Amino acid sequence: MLNFMRIITLLFAFAAAAFADTPAEENKPAAETFKAPKEVAPGVFEIGLVRVDKSAGTVSFPAKVNMVDGLLEYLLVTPQGPAHESLFVSDAPPKEVHMAMLLLGAKGMAQPKDGAIAGRIDSESLARAPKLTGDKITITAVWKDKAGKEQVTRVERWIVRMIVSRKKASETVPAEDGPWLYTGSFFYDNRFIAQTEGAHAALVTYPGALINNPRTGSNDDHEWFVNKESVPPKDTPVTFTIKLEPK
């Protein structure tokens, strides 16, 4: 435990210094917008809205269903991010989720050389996006159904992919069950891009997001849609849980 607490201290010092130059909330200095980890039980830590369970290898935080129909580019964003094209929204700051994942030992992609990829998703950015790497993670959502019974599902089961072919009619298929990639975002021009853009998790390749989609079709911004047959009602509260897969 002493070694782990030392890691926490070092990570917090690093994160506080790294994020000190990112834009602060209006009328607040940057130092006040970053929460220090607090141990609430043996091996369990909270960073603001984010909870880290070291033994379970999980990071959890509150979110809510944001869309029940339509085209998606993101799985999860903040309310200040591109919420008009995201399945979930969460008030948890991406920088605090990132610190929580660092506490679990997650590793993302290398810092990209081209800062131009920090922009929003479009055909040009997709064409020049690097091949993304990172640790594999599983993402689940916990919510209560109409009867008040707790349910747990893999988040990809609330997503479908539309496959368009010149040779036959378009086909809609469920998103494949499987891991996501913790790519970890990056810094550019003294900004942590996931925090600046409010981008937790992208369905369409976006290096600025903390999490990316490794499935076929992730390089196309017209293929991913809400699975309106299975997604809970809009604004349904969920607990978003990220589990780091064994390496």
Model-identified regions with their sequence ranges:
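N-terminal secretory signal peptides that target proteins for export/translocation
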Residues: 1-5
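Bacterial N-terminal signal peptides
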Residues: 6-17
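Boundary at the C-terminal end of the N-terminal hydrophobic targeting segment
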Residues: 18-20, 24
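Long, low-hydrophobicity ectodomains and other hydrophilic envelope-associated domains
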Residues: 27-247
